[in-house]
């Protein structure tokens, strides 16, 4: 049981190391820092961006490093697609 958990942790660590190495080559240091900040606030959004960037890099569609400004544009596009609008309606008030 513990051996399986240890192997699982090691496998996840290896995958994260590979992802980090790829992101290091395709992102400028400023863009990497921004992605790290996003990961702290919205981990699911950062994960989606990381996976998308890695897929683009592996398919050869990224020719130069992605700058901070380009990452901002990507974040804005994904944020507008995944943004949820909340509407609060008050049915009854406690005072008259």
UniProtKB/Swiss-Prot annotation:
Family: Belongs to the PDCD5 family.
Pfam families hit by this protein: dsDNA_bind (PF01984)
Source species: Sulfolobus acidocaldarius (strain ATCC 33909 / DSM 639 / JCM 8929 / NBRC 15157 / NCIMB 11770)
Entry-linked SUPFAM superfamilies: Double-stranded DNA-binding domain (SSF46950)
InterPro entries: DNA_bind_arc (IPR022889), PDCD5-like (IPR002836), PDCD5-like_sf (IPR036883)
Protein's name according to its UniProt entry: DNA-binding protein Saci_1468
Tree of life domain: Archaea
GO-annotated cellular components: cytosol
Cystine crosslinks: none
One of the record's GO molecular function terms: DNA binding
Keywords: DNA-binding
The keyword DNA-binding is annotated on this UniProt entry: yes
């Amino acid at each position: 049981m513990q051996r399986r958990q240890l192997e699982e942790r090691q496998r996840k660590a290896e995958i994260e190391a590979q992802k980090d190495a790829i992101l290091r080559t395709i992102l400028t240091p400023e863009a990497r820092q921004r992605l790290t900040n996003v990961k702290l606030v919205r981990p699911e959004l950062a994960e989606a961006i990381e996976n998308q960037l890695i897929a683009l890099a592996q398919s050869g569609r990224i020719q130069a490093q992605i700058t901070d400004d380009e990452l901002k544009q990507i974040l804005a596009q994904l944020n507008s697609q995944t943004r949820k609008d909340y509407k609060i309606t008050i049915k009854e008030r406690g005072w008259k």
